[in-house]
Amino acid sequence: MSCPYAGNGNEHDDGAVPLSNEVGKIYGEYLMLDKLLDAQCMLSMEDKRPVHDEHLFIITHQAYELWFKQIIFEFDSIRVMLDEEVIDETKTLEIVKRLNRVVLILKLLVDQVPILETMTPLDFMDFRKYLAPASGFQSLQFRLIENKLGVLTEQRVKYNQKYSDVFGNDERALHAIRSSEDGPSLLVLVQRWLERTPGLEEEGFNFWSKFQQSVDQFLAAQVQSALLEPVEWAKNYRLMDIEKRREVYRSIFDPAVHEALVKRGDRRFSHRALQGAIMITFYRDEPRFSQPHQLLTLLMDIDSLITKWRYNHVIMVQRMIGSQQLGTGGSSGYQYLRSTLSDRYKVFLDLFNLSTFLIPREAIPPLDETIRKKLVHKSV
């Protein structure tokens, strides 16, 4: 079967088919396979004590880094599209497509961990001494992914030093780190986008006011139902549960409470952005909110998959070196990695918690004709 990327069939002297007459590059030249396939330098081989599984270790991590590069490429393009005052529907569709691509890449990376686990702890010990002081903590691209996604420096777990210190005097790496910290992250850009959600305007549909009224009516109906409970302890339990729910809703309706939660690190979005996310969730069946809802869902998928990847990495490290040893780069190994599984590393934490504030479908404020027309004719 001929290569689908071939041109008119003209061959080089070695029998290879060029991509096209114009470019004049064969498959290996185009992909620079001479460099790519010659980049596996086994230190155990150089030491005249070759360890077979070191090759797998190198290949697996190089594959990770290649996919990290693609994720960064996608994130950067998405950030450019989001960094506009008005995002039309065609761009929203493209953003959704590229986020979905990142999701599929991350699924692949999660599934790649078991391949590395075919190596036993004893096999790993045979060449582990060659790795120091190298460490996965020194993966520049993974740090860039975290920063571009929206992991804040103050949210990071401290273990020995500032995370960027591991790059020493590497000016290129330090410049990339600073740029990723200073530029608008996906979290910041998505927040700005959500703040512009049509229907939040107080002089217009004023969704937030209507939502508060619906919640008050919903809770009042719950109280009336609880008061009819004939069993005293059951009635008191239901009333107590309703009061707890009222406090939960107060945390989103009271801006001061919300801001306190943001400062504490328990929330990420601004108050208005959270309103936009809730509105999109309620009216996701509306044509204009369909793609935005997909976008928010994909952001949660990305967060979830990165957490799954971290978890798989933690389990693999525990299998390979146990839970007491230091990592090859001097980090606290398993203990440090386990600490990164907390919600502090979940960038779009607020999206995961939206279900806390849902109300029954029949209690959702109905859209009036004005906002329906706005959702049909205006980009989000």
Curated annotation (Swiss-Prot):
Heme-dependent dioxygenase that catalyzes the oxidative cleavage of the L-tryptophan (L-Trp) pyrrole ring and converts L-tryptophan to N-formyl-L-kynurenine. Catalyzes the oxidative cleavage of the indole moiety. Its cofactor is heme. The keyword Metal-binding applies. Binds 1 heme group per subunit. One of its GO terms (molecular function) is tryptophan 2,3-dioxygenase activity. Pfam families: Trp_dioxygenase. Pathway: Amino-acid degradation; L-tryptophan degradation via kynurenine pathway; L-kynurenine from L-tryptophan: step 1/2; Pigment biosynthesis; ommochrome biosynthesis. It comes from the Eukaryota. InterPro entries: Trp/Indoleamine_2_3_dOase-like, Trp_2_3_dOase. One of its GO terms (biological process) is L-tryptophan catabolic process to acetyl-CoA. It catalyses: L-tryptophan + O2 = N-formyl-L-kynurenine. The keyword Cell membrane does not apply. Belongs to the tryptophan 2,3-dioxygenase family. Homotetramer. Dimer of dimers. Keywords: Dioxygenase, Heme, Iron, Metal-binding, Oxidoreductase, Tryptophan catabolism. Its EC number is 1.13.11.11. Substrate binds at F57, I58, I59, T60, H61, R128, T328. Heme binds at H313. Transmembrane segments: none annotated. This is Tryptophan 2,3-dioxygenase. It comes from Drosophila virilis.
